[in-house]
């Protein structure tokens, strides 16, 4: 798979910060994914991938402290966010419109993409936070206040979780892992709700399982953020170790331990359609650096940092 995908790239950047710290390749890729004005579609045509693009700027600034890059990129960030805000619905939320690909994940099971997905709103909110941060860095106080105001529920008390989506103002009964795990490591919920999500969603085998390294990245990060490093280590050994036992020499686009033989090679309706060397496959690099060695920037560019193994 040789195209540059925003959702894949953001994970590559995070791994890079703990392995090579090659800032130049990160900056080039962020610029490449943004493209030129006027904005006529989402990044890679995928709504969630536009939000990952904003988040990648947030992450890059945190790890590098490179304010000059933010200054250069900010006008393109503005026009990209203007495009997003021009496509919100009457509730001020994002949902798939004509020409949009609402991706989320390659799921083994039905994943409803209709209406207002809580997952997309969480990413949208984080993108607005990024815009507010960057507006402050470049001295754009007017727009900083606008973006902060736009930051704004999908919580279901009986399920002790964020529901998957809302259609025509009505909460669905479905609960998936996606919004719940992101809301944990974005620190959007009270400690009590985070613990509720850990038990009712993340450690609940009845919730639709994730079978891509792409989203296992975030699932395991949420568990690490909740102090479940021992559980995550077992999962890393079983999941990535499972690929190694199948003969992998690089990590795959998708891996379902319940499959066998050539089933592991098929995807997209093609018997050998799966990428076996995929950008989103190597999340243990990031998880081990951040949550096991415990190295994290507290302020931009490691002006302050914590090391808590």
Model-derived features: where do they sit?
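Active-site-proximal structural scaffolding
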Residues: 5, 22, 26, 46-53, ...
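Short, hydrophobic/amphipathic alpha-helical patches that form generic packing surfaces
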Residues: 15-19, 183-187, 286-293
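Structural helix-adjacent loops and short alpha-helical linkers that scaffold large soluble proteins
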Residues: 17-30, 61-81, 89, 132-155, ...
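The feature captures the catalytic groove of carbohydrate-active enzymes
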Residues: 36-52, 85-152, 156-221
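Repeat-solenoid scaffold signature
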Residues: 206-246
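Non-catalytic C-terminal accessory modules of carbohydrate-active enzymes
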Residues: 233-309
């Amino acid at each position: 798979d040789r195209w540059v995908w925003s959702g894949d790239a953001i994970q590559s950047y995070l791994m890079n910060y703990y392995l090579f710290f090659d800032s130049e390749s990160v900056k080039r890729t962020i610029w490449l994914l943004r493209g030129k004005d006027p904005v006529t579609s989402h990044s890679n045509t995928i709504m969630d991938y536009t939000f990952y693009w904003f988040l990648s700027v947030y992450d890059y600034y945190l790890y590098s402290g490179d304010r000059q890059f933010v200054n250069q990129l900010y006008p393109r960030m503005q026009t990209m966010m203007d495009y997003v805000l021009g496509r919100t619905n009457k509730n001020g939320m994002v949902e798939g419109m004509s020409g949009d690909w609402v991706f989320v994940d390659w799921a083994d099971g039905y994943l409803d993409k209709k209406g207002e997905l809580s997952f997309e709103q969480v990413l949208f909110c984080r993108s607005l936070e990024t815009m507010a941060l960057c507006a402050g860095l470049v001295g754009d106080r007017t727009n900083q206040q606008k973006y902060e105001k736009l930051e704004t529920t999908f919580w279901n008390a009986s399920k002790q979780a964020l529901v998957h989506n809302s259609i025509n103002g009505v909460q669905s009964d479905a609960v998936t892992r996606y919004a719940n795990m992101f809301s944990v490591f974005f620190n959007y919920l009270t400690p009590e709700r985070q613990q509720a999500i850990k038990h009712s969603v993340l450690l609940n085998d009845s919730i639709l399982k994730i079978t891509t390294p792409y989203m296992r990245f975030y699932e395991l990060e949420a568990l690490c953020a909740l102090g479940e490093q021992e559980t995550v280590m077992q999962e890393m050994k079983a999941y990535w170790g499972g690929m190694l036992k199948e003969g992998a020499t690089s990590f795959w686009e998708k891996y379902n331990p319940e499959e066998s033989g050539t089933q592991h090679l098929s995807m997209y309706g093609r018997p050998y359609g799966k990428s076996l060397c995929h950008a989103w496959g190597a999340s243990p690099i990031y998880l081990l650096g951040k949550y096991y060695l415990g190295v994290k920037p507290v302020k931009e560019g490691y002006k302050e940092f914590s090391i808590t193994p």
